[in-house]
Amino acid sequence: MEALSGMHEPSPFVALMRIYCNDYTNRHDTSVCPLIMEPGYTLHMGVHDLVGRDERYTPAAMKQFTQFPGLCLTVNQIVTNGDRLVMRFSEHGASNRHDGRVAAWNGIGLYRWNGKKLLENFVEQDYFSRTVQLDGGDPLPVENPAIAPWDSPAEPENPAAEAFVRGLIESGDILDQPALLFDDEWISGAAGDRVIEPESAVINDIFSAGDHVAFHVAMSGRLRADSVLAGDNAGEKVLLHMGAVVRVEQDELVWGRGVRDRLGLKRRLAQS
């Protein structure tokens, strides 16, 4: 069949992620994992590193599928340069550990592959929001799906945009960007709880594609008194992991979405 006029060639990385989303995640079929992931596949989320596809990753995935037997993944955005790919997504379903209560939550994953299979993923999911919903809060809406995620083209790297965003992260100014919305702030459209006053950051991953830059960072700083997480811990030095994808135009961050490990931070504060 000839390609439709004006259509670009599909990205092989995007084609792999189509299998990841449709054949593996949404069918809960872990037998697909060896077809799309190398044995050493590693998932990084918050302070956790799940090293090994069969030893660590697959059992964790099965635990999720057991809790949410009807779990669905909806793709909200895919950006790739061919070598790297970021996927913004929503997961939603009913938890059999919470009497069937339903929840929807966002996630952002930065994927690495070797041209054939997945090697690594730096990901954050908004489990804080999920917990609030499952504990009796109103379920959040599922964000609109990407119109044509599997037709997302590979775009060239943009070193200038990447350097600009790296500078925002290293200075701490990334948290002051009004166009960067975290977690469920997309519903109101306004930036809210910034959680910490940043002091330093470790960039775990960063790459660019066209005018987009994706990054995953571990940011250290003081817990803000106005944060919902503060309580008696205001001013305490904490570590907050976050993943994001932003769009840069003429040295300005004009759009962005991020997800933070607020639940992990809350649990660490409770243990301190």
Per-range role (PLM):
Residues 1-272:
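C-terminal and inter-domain tail/linker signature
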